[in-house]
C-alpha cells in the first residue's frame, strides 16, 4: 500500500513545488522516473513468456499520447468523446478494447481537477500525467494483440487536428439530430413514388373481360354484328352504357388510333325500337308457330325465309337506322320464351 501512495505523493509534490527550486524539482523527477521504471521492469519480467497453448486471457494496456502541446487550440477530448460520449462508446464496441481519457486536462472542471490532483489519492494520480488515452484489452493472446492493433489504428484517426474531416462532420450531423434540428422533421414520412394497387374485382370498363353469364334459354336474341352458329352460345355483353364499336365500318378520323378488337355489344346499346323491335312487331311469333302445326302448302315455302314477312321489313335494315337509338335505352316487356325466329325445318335432321 505504501508503494501505491508513494508515486502520487511524489507527483503532487512536484506540481506544488515552486519553479525556483530547480534542484528539488530535478530530484523529484528522477525519483518518479525511477519508480515508474521499476514497475515497468516487473511487468516485463512477468510477460517474459507467453503461453498460447492454454489460451488464457492476458491483459494488454497502452497509453497513447494526445498531441495537445503541438496543437494547443484543438479540442481533442471533445472529438474523442463525441456528442454525449457516443463516439468513444462506439469506438470501444467496434475495437473490443476499453478506452479512457486520462491525464491533465481530461476533466472539464479545472478547479475540480486541481482539487482531486492535490488530494493524493491513487485513483487520481493520472491527473499529474500528460493528457493521454489509456487502451486496455483483456482477451486471449492472439485476439488481444489483434484488438490492440485495431484500437491503435482507429484512435489515430481521432488525433488528427482537422475540423472538417469525416469524423467531425458525422459528429455534427449526430449533434443536430440529437438536438432535434434535423431538416426533415420527425414524423414526416419519406416521399416516394406511390405504388398502384390493382383491384381484385374484374374491371367492367371498355374492353374489360367480365365473367361469362349462364347459358341462355332457347330463343334469346343475340347482339348485332355477331355471327350466329347453331349450337354456339352468344358472346357475353359488356357493361351498360359503355361505347363499343359498331359492326359496320365508319369513316376514319385523322389522328384516330384503331381501337382494340371489338368487344361484345350489349342488348341495351341499341334498344328494341331500331331494327329488330320496330319491324318484327308487325309479325308476331304466332305466325312462325303456325308453320309447325299447319300442313305445308308448297315445297318452296320451306326455303323461303321471308315467309310471312313483307318486303318492307327487310328494307328497314338501312345503314342510317343503325345509328338511331332510343334515348331511354330500356328493354321492352319480356316476351314469351318461344324462339325469336323459325329455323329451317330440315335443319334439325
Curated annotation (Swiss-Prot):
Q: What is its main location?
A: nucleus
Expression sites by tissue: Expressed in the cortex, cerebellum, striatum, midbrain, brainstem and thalamus of the brain (at protein level). Expressed in neurons (at protein level). Expressed in brain and testis. Expressed in the dentate gyrus of the hippocampus.
Record localization: Nucleus
Is Transcription regulation tagged as a keyword? yes
Query: Where is the PTM Omega-N-methylarginine found along the chain?
Result: 230, 240
Q: Which GO terms describe its biological process?
A: mRNA processing; regulation of alternative mRNA splicing, via spliceosome; regulation of mRNA splicing, via spliceosome
| Signal sequence, start to end | none
Q: Pfam families of this UniProt entry?
A: KH-I_KHDC4-BBP, Qua1, Sam68-YY
- Keyword Nucleus annotated: yes
Which residues does the UniProt record annotate as the domain KH?
Answer: 65-135
Q: Which residues cross the membrane?
A: none
Which molecular-function annotations from GO does this UniProt entry contain?
mRNA binding; poly(A) binding; poly(U) RNA binding; SH2 domain binding; SH3 domain binding
Q: What does this protein's UniProt record list under function?
A: RNA-binding protein that plays a role in the regulation of alternative splicing and influences mRNA splice site selection and exon inclusion. Its phosphorylation by FYN inhibits its ability to regulate splice site selection. Induces an increased concentration-dependent incorporation of exon in CD44 pre-mRNA by direct binding to purine-rich exonic enhancer. May function as an adapter protein for Src kinases during mitosis. Binds both poly(A) and poly(U) homopolymers. Phosphorylation by PTK6 inhibits its RNA-binding ability.
Subunit description: Self-associates to form homooligomers. Interacts with SAFB, SFRS9 and YTHDC1. Found in a complex with KHDRBS1, KHDRBS2 and KHDRBS3. Interacts with RBMX. Interacts with the SH3 domains of FYN and PLCG1. Interacts with the SH2 domains of FYN, GRAP2, PLCG1 and RASA1. Interacts with RBMX.
Could you identify this protein by its name? KH domain-containing, RNA-binding, signal transduction-associated protein 2
Amino acid at each position: 500500500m505504501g508503494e501505491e501512495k508513494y508515486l502520487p505523493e511524489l507527483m503532487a509534490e512536484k506540481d506544488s513545488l515552486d519553479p525556483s527550486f530547480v534542484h528539488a524539482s530535478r530530484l523529484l523527477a528522477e525519483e518518479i522516473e525511477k519508480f515508474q521504471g521499476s514497475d515497468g521492469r516487473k511487468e516485463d519480467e512477468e510477460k517474459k513468456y507467453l503461453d498460447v497453448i492454454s489460451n488464457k486471457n492476458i491483459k494488454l494496456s497502452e497509453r497513447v499520447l494526445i498531441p495537445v502541446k503541438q496543437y494547443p487550440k484543438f479540442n481533442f477530448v471533445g472529438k474523442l468523446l463525441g456528442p454525449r460520449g457516443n463516439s468513444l462508446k462506439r469506438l470501444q464496441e467496434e475495437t473490443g478494447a476499453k478506452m479512457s481519457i486520462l491525464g491533465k486536462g481530461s476533466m472539464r472542471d479545472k478547479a475540480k481537477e486541481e482539487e482531486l490532483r492535490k488530494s493524493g489519492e491513487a485513483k487520481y494520480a493520472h491527473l499529474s500525467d500528460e493528457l493521454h488515452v489509456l487502451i486496455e484489452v483483456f482477451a486471449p493472446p492472439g485476439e488481444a494483440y489483434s484488438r490492440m492493433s485495431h484500437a491503435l489504428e482507429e484512435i489515430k484517426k481521432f488525433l488528427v487536428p482537422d475540423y472538417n474531416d469525416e469524423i467531425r462532420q458525422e459528429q455534427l450531423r449526430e449533434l443536430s439530430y440529437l438536438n432535434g434540428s434535423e431538416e426533415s422533421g420527425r414524423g414526416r414520412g419519406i416521399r416516394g413514388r406511390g405504388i398502384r394497387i390493382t383491384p381484385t374485382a374484374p374491371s367492367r370498363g371498355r374492353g374489360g373481360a367480365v365473367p361469362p353469364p349462364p347459358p341462355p334459354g332457347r330463343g334469346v336474341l343475340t347482339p348485332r354484328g355477331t355471327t350466329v352458329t347453331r349450337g354456339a352460345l352468344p358472346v357475353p355483353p359488356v357493361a351498360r352504357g359503355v361505347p363499343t364499336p359498331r359492326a359496320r365500318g365508319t369513316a376514319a378520323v385523322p389522328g384516330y388510333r384503331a381501337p382494340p378488337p371489338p368487344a361484345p355489344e350489349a342488348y341495351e346499346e341499341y334498344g328494341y325500337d331500331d331494327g329488330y323491335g320496330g319491324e318484327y312487331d308487325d309479325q308476331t311469333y304466332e305466325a312462325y308457330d303456325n308453320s309447325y302445326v299447319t300442313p305445308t302448302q308448297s315445297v318452296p315455302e320451306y326455303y323461303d325465309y321471308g315467309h310471312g314477312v313483307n318486303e318492307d321489313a327487310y328494307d328497314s335494315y338501312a345503314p342510317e337506322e343503325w345509328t338511331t337509338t332510343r334515348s331511354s335505352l330500356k328493354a321492352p316487356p319480356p316476351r314469351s320464351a318461344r324462339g325469336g325466329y323459325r329455323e329451317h325445318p330440315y335443319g334439325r335432321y
